[in-house]
């Protein structure tokens, strides 16, 4: 049963935005200036809360970023640092891979960090490090030796800069520019102070070292990649083939060996932490306690059904103490919400109730208070104000498809919603002042940034980004369609959210083809009231007379463990059933041409598009699959084993979750594409399907992009891709002149 939701409850009640009615072209979708307007990124508040700083792409080149600032008192916005003043150059292979893991794309200033005293900024650029002092506006190039500096950090009190170069950790003393190599054995299979591939790609841990708050020590991980199978990967570029040796831990194979050490300063002596007898584990998080004497780390079992928070006194020989022992017989999700309180104890989020909520623990690991409750999920802790006794966090209490900002007392009382507008809110707080930045967007509002007081009152716009004359979107806004939201009921009784975009100049007496845009994988949502550049292509299709439907199937994120974990040990069963249910609903609509329903997705969505096409060919006449996983034994350990278990224990689950057993059902109507230098979902995933279809004598279409990685970055690549997808759909649907 479909239950349409009022647009007024989740988005603007208008069907379109206000503005001009110029049609979109594929060439315009990802050209400069960005249709979203000025969308600041890397939002930060200075430690004293006096300045908001952020990166903004240039109008003539949206991927070249400068550093901007706003004076909190006066509201004046100005450029703080012109990135052209910094040396631009070729990135190292390690930095290219690190940015790909972070999904960062661009030039100019891509990251920066405030000094703790608020008087200076550290700015990495193309392997060089720059130190910018606000008092005189001078930029100083720091000495970093001959290597390419990555993962640079200012020490907590601002006396040092640390960075990784040549797979070793280096320390620069700012007072005298003395450069010290802290680790010596990095190189080859040994990586010091660097996060391994799966830590970056799957655990969200991009660093491999951590400063003690008082600058007395640095914790670091030492990674030995020798147990990991080395694969020779062909990165195919337009002008040649690059053979890359990559240590890639495929499901069921060996992971890295990891050690956790502490370097005492200034002595530079190393103490190794006891991580236990089991050597097959993950180290997803490391964090110092405020006293700089105790170090915490999270220890996760290989099967991801055990997650321990352990604490060790780095000045003692005693073994680490386990403060929290999370257990789940399916899997445990990671997060970044651990916060140690200066008054003792800590805050921790857990899904032990079935939904992610905030808990307060005493120093010995006993739960003293559950701060949030209910059948809804907390997204993340945004800020902890110990003086006033507040925890600020984002969550889905009021709607599964929106993210709001809330605060609650340490004792769970005075639960208060601070954000007011419907959409997605992300807050950035100042360390020492009761103000925050609200990064907000919705289907009808491209990203905007505002400054608020601790009660949620807006004090000033940092970037209002209103869609009005002069805004890049304005001339197209009059044709910008907003969707209808609704719900369906899955076969197990759980609620499924969908959104449906009707074509421009919709006529209920006509029939329209429909494209189902899918992701369908864990931790993600597509059916949300948010702005997304992925919707630009949707808007273009709506102007070509193609409706677009999206449904978040079971297994997707922010809905609790029962909703997510139904996929355990067998992928593309519940997910495909739910997408079929979405098509069943579409078939009830008189204006939908049931013979012209296509499905399109990328990455996990590409996998879903293939599985829906092959397992339900009567539902999906056409499929477009981008960079799909097609055989889960080819994908990495941490992600794959979380959902399918170890292939040695679940061989049948792996086989039936693969695309290849279903190839025989294919008849026609498939387009596949893949980046030929993809180091995440390896190109081999697609070539295996190509070969199987060719061996069966089945006709299909494919586009392979030389030099492209998994994210398909770059305007030229995207423009060619979306022109190709449009042409394919128009031919399959027999639209226009095809």
What are these regions (language model features)?
Residues 3-7, 11-435, 443-445, 451-452, ...:
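Beta-propeller folds
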Residues 42, 229-230, 272, 284, ...:
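Serine-hydrolase catalytic core recognition
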């Amino acid at each position: 049963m479909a239950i349409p939701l009022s647009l007024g409850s989740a988005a603007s009640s208008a069907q379109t935005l206000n503005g001009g009615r110029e049609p979109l072209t594929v060439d315009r979708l990802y050209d400069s200036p960005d249709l979203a307007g000025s969308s600041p990124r890397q939002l930060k508040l200075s430690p004293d809360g006096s300045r908001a700083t952020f990166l903004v792409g240039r109008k003539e080149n949206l991927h070249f970023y400068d550093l901007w600032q706003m004076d909190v008192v006066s509201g004046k916005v100005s450029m703080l640092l012109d990135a052209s003043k910094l040396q631009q150059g070729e990135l190292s292979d390690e930095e290219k891979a690190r940015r790909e893991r972070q999904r960062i794309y661009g030039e100019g200033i891509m990251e920066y960090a405030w000094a703790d005293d608020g008087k200076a900024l550290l700015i990495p650029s193309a392997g060089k490090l720059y130190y910018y002092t606000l008092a005189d506006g001078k930029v100083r190039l720091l000495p970093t030796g001959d290597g390419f500096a990555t993962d640079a950090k200012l020490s907590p009190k601002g006396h040092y800069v640390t960075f990784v170069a040549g797979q070793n950790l280096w320390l620069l003393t700012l007072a005298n520019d003395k450069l010290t190599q802290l680790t010596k054995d990095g190189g080859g299979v040994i990586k010091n102070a660097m996060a391994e591939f799966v830590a970056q790609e799957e655990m969200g841990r991009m660093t491999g070292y951590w400063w003690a708050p008082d600058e007395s020590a640095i914790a670091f991980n030492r990674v030995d990649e020798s147990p990991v199978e080395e694969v020779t990967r062909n990165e195919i570029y337009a002008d040649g083939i690059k053979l890359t040796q990559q240590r890639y831990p495929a499901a069921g194979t060996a992971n890295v060996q990891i050690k956790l050490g502490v370097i005492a300063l200034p002595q530079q002596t190393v103490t190794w932490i006891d991580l236990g007898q089991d050597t097959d584990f993950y180290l997803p998080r490391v964090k110092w306690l405020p006293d700089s004497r105790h170090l915490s780390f999270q220890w996760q079992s290989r099967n991801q059904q055990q997650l321990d928070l352990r604490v060790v006194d780095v000045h003692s020989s005693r073994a680490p103490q386990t403060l929290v022992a999370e257990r789940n017989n399916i899997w445990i999700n990671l997060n970044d919400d651990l916060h140690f309180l200066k008054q003792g104890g800590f805050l921790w989020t857990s899904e032990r109730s079935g939904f992610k909520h905030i808990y307060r623990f005493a120093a010995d690991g006993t739960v003293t208070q559950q701060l949030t409750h209910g059948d809804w999920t907390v997204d993340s802790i945004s800020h902890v104000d110990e003086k006033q006794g507040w925890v600020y966090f984002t969550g889905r209490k009021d709607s599964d498809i929106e993210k709001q900002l809330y605060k609650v007392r340490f004792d769970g009382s005075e639960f208060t919603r601070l954000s007011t507008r419907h959409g997605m809110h992300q807050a950035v707080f100042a360390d020492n002042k009761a103000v925050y930045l609200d990064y907000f967007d919705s289907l009808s509002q491209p990203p905007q940034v505002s400054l608020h007081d601790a009660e949620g009152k807006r004090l000033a716009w940092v970037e209002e980004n209103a869609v009005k004359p002069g805004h890049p979107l304005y001339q197209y806004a009059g044709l910008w369609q907003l969707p209808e939201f609704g719900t369906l009921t899955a076969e197990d009784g759980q609620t499924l959210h969908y959104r449906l975009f009707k074509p421009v100049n919709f006529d209920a007496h006509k029939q329209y083809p429909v494209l189902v845009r899918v992701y369908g994988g864990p931790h993600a949502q597509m059916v949300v009231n948010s702005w997304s550049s992925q919707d630009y292509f949707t808007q273009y299709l709506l102007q070509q007379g193609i409706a677009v439907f999206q449904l978040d199937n079971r297994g997707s994120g922010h809905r609790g463990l029962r909703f997510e974990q139904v996929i355990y040990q067998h992928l593309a069963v519940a997910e495909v059933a739910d997408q079929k249910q979405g098509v069943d609903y579409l078939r009830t609509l008189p204006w939908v041409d049931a013979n012209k329903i296509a499905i399109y997705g990328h990455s996990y969505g590409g996998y879903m598009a293939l599985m829906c096409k092959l397992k339900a060919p009567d539902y999906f006449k056409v499929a477009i699959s981008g960079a799909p996983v097609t055989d889960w034994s080819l994908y990495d350990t941490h992600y794959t084993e979380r959902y399918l278990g170890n292939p040695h224990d679940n061989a049948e689950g792996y086989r039936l979750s693969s695309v290849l057993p279903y190839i025989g059902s294919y008849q026609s109507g498939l387009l596949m594409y893949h980046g030929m230098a993809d180091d995440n979902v390896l190109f081999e995933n697609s070539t295996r399907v190509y070969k199987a279809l060719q061996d069966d004598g089945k006709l299909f279409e494919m586009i392979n992009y030389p030099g492209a990685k998994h994210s398909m970055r770059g305007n030229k690549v995207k423009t060619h891709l979306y022109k190709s997808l449009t042409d394919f759909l128009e031919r399959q649907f027999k639209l226009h002149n095809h």
